[in-house]
């Protein structure tokens, strides 16, 4: 009798373990595969597409065109590093000082939460996980980030990030964004245009690259200053990112 009472719990544990094993194999395989193969779509793209269909919007298309780093202007990589993660070449996936500052800020300003995700974390989240905030998702994100940093080069992480980042409603990846907003390939983006695209990244569904608000213009100017302070294009070659 005693053994029977514990059977449902044991079965649940076995089921959860099997699910975790399947997910680990799936994500591990994805990390290995996408270290060399172009990424056709991300979890965020799938989530956006399904959400649109469920709302009856059958005209929505989550669009992305893969571009290798040699087909992307070096200004674009520099712009997202300047805007999102200036220690990207140095850290192993996590910026401890940025996390500490974000925690201190969030304790003082509970209504204005600040994140501290690195480009590596954002790539892991956008590629493999669902949108939202939870300790479970953050834990999975941390594990996937370690996987990316272990298997991929920094250049590969940046390349995938630029190809799956959301730049507007249905616009994913810098090639699609460059064509949509500037009618040119990503390889021809100027320093100013790259900074403008990077300026909308905190909230690409609210901020518009084709109709920039005063805040977006101000952020663009700040990013341009940071790009110059980092050393311009030489920063990319010096850190083997281009």
Curated annotation (Swiss-Prot):
The keyword Membrane applies. It comes from the Bacteria. Pathway: Cell wall biogenesis; peptidoglycan biosynthesis. It catalyses: [GlcNAc-(1->4)-Mur2Ac(oyl-L-Ala-gamma-D-Glu-L-Lys-D-Ala-D-Ala)](n)-di-trans,octa-cis-undecaprenyl diphosphate + beta-D-GlcNAc-(1->4)-Mur2Ac(oyl-L-Ala-gamma-D-Glu-L-Lys-D-Ala-D-Ala)-di-trans,octa-cis-undecaprenyl diphosphate = [GlcNAc-(1->4)-Mur2Ac(oyl-L-Ala-gamma-D-Glu-L-Lys-D-Ala-D-Ala)](n+1)-di-trans,octa-cis-undecaprenyl diphosphate + di-trans,octa-cis-undecaprenyl diphosphate + H(+). The chain crosses the membrane at residues 19-39. Its main location: membrane. InterPro entries: Glyco_trans_51, Lysozyme-like_dom_sf, PBP_transglycosylase, Pep_trsgly. This is Biosynthetic peptidoglycan transglycosylase. It comes from Citrobacter koseri (strain ATCC BAA-895 / CDC 4225-83 / SGSC4696). The lineage of its organism: Bacteria, Pseudomonadati, Pseudomonadota, Gammaproteobacteria, Enterobacterales.
């Amino acid at each position: 009798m005693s053994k029977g009472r514990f059977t449902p719990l044991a079965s649940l544990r076995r089921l959860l373990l099997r699910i975790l094993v399947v997910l680990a194999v799936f994500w591990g395989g994805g990390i290995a595969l996408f270290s060399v193969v172009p990424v056709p779509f991300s979890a965020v793209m799938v989530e956006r597409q399904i959400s649109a269909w469920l709302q009856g919007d059958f005209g929505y298309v989550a669009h992305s065109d893969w571009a290798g780093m040699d087909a992307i202007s070096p200004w674009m990589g520099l712009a997202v590093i300047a805007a999102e993660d200036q220690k990207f070449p140095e850290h192993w996936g996590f910026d401890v000082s940025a996390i500490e500052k974000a925690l201190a800020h969030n304790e003082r300003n509970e209504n204005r939460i600040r994140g501290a995700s690195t480009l590596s974390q954002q790539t892991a989240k956008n590629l493999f996980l669902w949108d939202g905030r939870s300790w479970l998702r953050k834990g999975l994100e941390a594990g996937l980030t370690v996987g990316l940093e272990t298997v991929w080069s920094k250049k590969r992480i940046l390349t995938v990030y630029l190809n799956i980042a959301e730049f507007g409603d249905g616009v994913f990846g810098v090639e699609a964004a460059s064509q949509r907003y500037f009618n040119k390939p990503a390889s021809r983006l100027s320093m100013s245009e790259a900074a403008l695209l990077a300026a909308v990244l905190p909230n690409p569904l609210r901020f518009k690259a084709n109709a920039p608000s005063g805040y977006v213009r101000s952020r663009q100017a700040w990013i341009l200053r940071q790009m110059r302070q980092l050393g311009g294009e030489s920063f990319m070659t010096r850190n083997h990112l281009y």
